[in-house]
């Protein structure tokens, strides 16, 4: 198991068990306003995960905050819960955006975080945040979220290209709902149930193939040897094999793909 996989599994356990690790020095806070989940992450000055909280959410759609009050309340609740558990107060945070988002939407995302008394000291794009966790200097990071799929291409540790496409887990759910003749909410529940994966995956596979075809187009000319896929929508067991077949490029999915970007946001909670 790669080091980052051990880190991600440990971080997941902290969230599930509502625990925190002993720490020394300064803490860094990251707030990820996702389409399906809001995740708040805490790391120490060595980027070791210390604590975290996750909350299912529908306050963001395609990288745009559609329920400001709901988002603010959720972040305030999670921040308060972590502060009470750890006996600390947080004053600064980093947050993240899909690549290519317009500046007005960036401001709204920052405003949500600042509405709970946090000073936003860094806004990073989501795939680049994920690259921080994975320790990538060369390759492509594809962040498959609920509403959008973002890609960053890195060369020698520098981001040389970013893009965002409006397709993601929500589109899988819509296809599934149409196929099963059920509501969006029911399809979302079925999609997230690991026991239903044999039923679900053949239905959503064309959506994954479309995502991979888009990524293949973006990486042409960049000599990409490996693609890392992260985000909750890539949790299917065969996701990376479909991606690899479609792109012709080795594709790796870390453990706990939903938590990669949120953890990377906390790691980048430092003044730029």
Locate the predicted segments by residue:
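Nucleotide/phosphate-binding catalytic cleft detector across ATP-hydrolyzing
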Residues: 1-35, 39-144, 158-272
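Short glycine-rich anion-binding loops that position phosphate/pyrophosphate groups of nucleotides
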Residues: 147
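A structural feature that tracks compact, well-ordered secondary-structure segments
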Residues: 150-152
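A cytosolic small-molecule/anion-sensing beta-strand core signal
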Residues: 155
């Amino acid at each position: 198991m790669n080091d980052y996989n051990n880190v991600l599994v440990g971080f997941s356990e902290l969230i599930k068990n509502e625990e925190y690790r002993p720490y020394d020095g300064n803490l860094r806070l990251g707030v990820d306003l996702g389409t399906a989940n809001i995740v708040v992450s805490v790391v120490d000055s060595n980027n070791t995960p210390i604590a975290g909280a996750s909350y299912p959410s529908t306050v963001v759609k395609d990288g745009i905050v559609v329920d400001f009050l709901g988002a603010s309340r959720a972040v305030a609740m999670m921040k308060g819960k972590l502060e009470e558990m750890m006996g600390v107060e947080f004053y600064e945070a980093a947050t993240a955006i899909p690549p290519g988002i317009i500046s007005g939407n960036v401001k709204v995302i920052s405003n949500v975080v600042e509405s709970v008394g946090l000073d936003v000291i860094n806004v990073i794009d989501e795939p680049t945040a994920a690259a921080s966790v994975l320790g990538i200097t060369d390759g492509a990071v594809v962040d498959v979220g609920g509403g959008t799929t973002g890609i960053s291409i890195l060369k020698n540790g520098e981001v040389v290209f970013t893009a965002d496409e409006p397709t993601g887990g929500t589109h899988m759910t819509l296809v599934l709902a149409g196929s099963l003749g059920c509501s969006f909410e029911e399809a979302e529940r079925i999609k997230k149930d690991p026991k239903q994966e044999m039923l679900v995956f053949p239905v959503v596979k064309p959506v994954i193939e479309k995502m991979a075809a888009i990524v293949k187009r973006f990486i042409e000319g960049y000599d990409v040897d490996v693609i890392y896929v992260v985000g909750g929508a890539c949790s299917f067991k065969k996701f990376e094999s479909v991606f690899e077949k479609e792109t012709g490029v080795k594709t790796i999915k870390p453990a706990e793909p939903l938590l990669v970007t949120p953890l990377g946001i906390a790691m980048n909670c430092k003044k730029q």
